[in-house]
């Protein structure tokens, strides 16, 4: 896939697109060499002071280090691994064990991403071991470094050709085919979870919400971003399938083509209304998968007539419209599968079944079946760090 296989020319694509690191980079660029760095723990570790945040990694991550992003979980820096000569994105998850839900999310992300091995799924390059096993509160995960994400591209005034959008869609589906074949649902696909580099390679990231495909408990922990949420999730269906990710892909692709969110709902009720205004009120036959409460709720809503996608989005290729309509189907049982989406005429120029691998061993969520304490989760993450750094065994 390395930018070949029908990839559009990428030279100018990322030029204007504000990359993930744009803002912090500008703040830091002035004194990038001046980010204070101190060797610690007998020179085995190095501490950086990033805007008042202590960032402590193994000494192989030499200066300079660059802040590239910030989130609720903590801070992300690009760093250079002097042993592998690779630039990576190191995410610090501060106070990772303060509550069980966050700790489990971090453990899930690590185990899942380490299990995956695919060009369109971001890879973990390292988990930094803690300097002291007994005081282990922050987790540092090093991922392969990408240039930007789809959210930044959509927000920028970077011109995107039809070929670019098509190639991004193809890569999302190619990665999703692999993820689903591992018996995993991503459950939180959105533009900011799709990373890109200057070569137009796309990688899916953030598996903290992922679930096994056969699991039926409703999402109790975190709220998936509403705008990309399938109707069955909005209606609290506990019996959701891989089709939830396909719905999200349809929303993302139309946002890419239209440069604005397809269904920017303000709340649950508004979200459902927006999608029905476009795809129409579902028929009785389409309600079969819902529980009685959800059916009753739908029946009392105003009747919406389905709009013509072709008329609403005249600038979008008719074959792309056909594929999106099959993705944005209300009834998940009728929604197109990832395999069939890859084989759709719109993607003929890119589709190559011999180059769309599946995962040979399904992922096991067994570690979630036990009520693990924070200490047990800490121990499991510590072991994951040692798998990358056996010499740090304490």
Swiss-Prot record:
Tissues in which the protein is found: Leaves, roots, root apices, and dormant and growing axillary buds.
Comment field on protein domains: The TXY motif contains the threonine and tyrosine residues whose phosphorylation activates the MAP kinases.
Enzyme Commission designation: 2.7.11.24
Gene Ontology terms for molecular function: ATP binding; MAP kinase activity; protein serine kinase activity
Claim: Nucleotide-binding is one of the keywords in the record: yes
Name of the protein in question: Mitogen-activated protein kinase homolog D5
Modified residues (Phosphothreonine): 220
CDD domains, per database record: STKc_TEY_MAPK
SUPFAM superfamilies in the record: Protein kinase-like (PK-like)
Residues annotated as catalytic: 188
Cofactor(s) of this protein: Mg(2+)
Family per record: Belongs to the protein kinase superfamily. CMGC Ser/Thr protein kinase family. MAP kinase subfamily.
Signal peptide: none
Species this protein is from: Pisum sativum
InterPro entries named in the record: Kinase-like_dom_sf, MAP_kinase, MAP_kinase_CS, Prot_kinase_dom, Protein_kinase_ATP_BS, Ser/Thr_kinase_AS
Domain Protein kinase as annotated: residue spans: 62-347
Keyword Phosphoprotein (UniProt): yes
Gene3D superfamilies with a match to the protein in the record: Phosphorylase Kinase, domain 1, Transferase(Phosphotransferase) domain 1
Known catalytic reactions: L-seryl-[protein] + ATP = O-phospho-L-seryl-[protein] + ADP + H(+); L-threonyl-[protein] + ATP = O-phospho-L-threonyl-[protein] + ADP + H(+)
Pfam family, one: Pkinase
Keywords: ATP-binding, Cell cycle, Kinase, Nucleotide-binding, Phosphoprotein, Serine/threonine-protein kinase, Transferase
Placement of sequence motif TXY: 220-222
Binding site residues for ATP: 68-76, 91
Entry superkingdom: Eukaryota
PTMs per UniProt: Dually phosphorylated on Thr-220 and Tyr-222, which activates the enzyme.
Regulation of activity: Activated by tyrosine and threonine phosphorylation.
Residue numbers of Phosphotyrosine PTMs: 222
């Amino acid at each position: 896939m390395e930018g070949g296989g029908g990839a559009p020319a990428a030279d100018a694509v990322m030029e204007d697109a504000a990359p993930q690191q744009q803002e912090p980079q500008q703040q830091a660029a002035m004194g990038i060499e001046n980010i204070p760095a101190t060797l610690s723990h007998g020179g085995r570790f190095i501490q950086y002071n990033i805007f008042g945040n202590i960032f402590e990694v193994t000494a192989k991550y030499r200066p300079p280090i660059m802040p590239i992003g910030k989130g609720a979980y903590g801070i992300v820096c690009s760093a250079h691994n002097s042993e592998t000569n690779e630039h990576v994105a190191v995410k610090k998850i501060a106070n990772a064990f303060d509550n069980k839900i966050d700790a489990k999310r971090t453990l899930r992300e690590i185990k899942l991403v380490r299990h995956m091995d695919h060009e369109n799924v971001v890879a973990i390059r390292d988990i930094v071991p803690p300097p002291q096993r007994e005081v282990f509160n922050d987790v540092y995960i090093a991922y392969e470094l990408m240039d930007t994400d789809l959210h930044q591209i959509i927000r920028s005034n970077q011109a995107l050709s039809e070929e670019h959008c098509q190639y991004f869609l193809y890569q999302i589906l190619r990665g999703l085919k692999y993820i689903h074949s591992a018996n995993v649902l991503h459950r939180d696909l959105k533009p900011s979870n799709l990373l890109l580099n200057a070569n137009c390679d796309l990688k899916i990231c953030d598996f903290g919400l992922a679930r096994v495909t056969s699991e039926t408990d409703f999402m109790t922990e975190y709220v998936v971003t509403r705008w990309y949420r399938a109707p069955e999730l909005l209606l609290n269906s506990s019996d959701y399938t891989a089709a939830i990710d396909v719905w999200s892909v349809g929303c993302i692709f139309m946002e890419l083509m239209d440069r604005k969110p397809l269904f920017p709902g303000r709340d649950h009720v508004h979200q459902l209304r927006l999608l029905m205004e476009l795809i129409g009120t579902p028929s009785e036959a389409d309600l079969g998968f819902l529980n009685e409460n959800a059916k009753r709720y739908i029946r009392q809503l105003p009747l919406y007539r389905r709009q013509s996608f072709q008329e609403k989005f005249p600038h979008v290729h008719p074959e792309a419209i056909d594929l999106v309509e099959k993705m944005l189907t209300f009834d998940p049982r009728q929604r197109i599968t990832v395999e069939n989406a890859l084989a759709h005429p719109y993607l003929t120029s890119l589709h190559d079944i011999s180059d769309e691998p599946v995962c040979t061993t399904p992922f096991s969520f067994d570690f979630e079946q036990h009520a693990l304490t924070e200490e047990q989760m800490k121990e499991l993450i510590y072991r994951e760090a040692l798998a990358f750094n056996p010499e740090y065994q304490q």
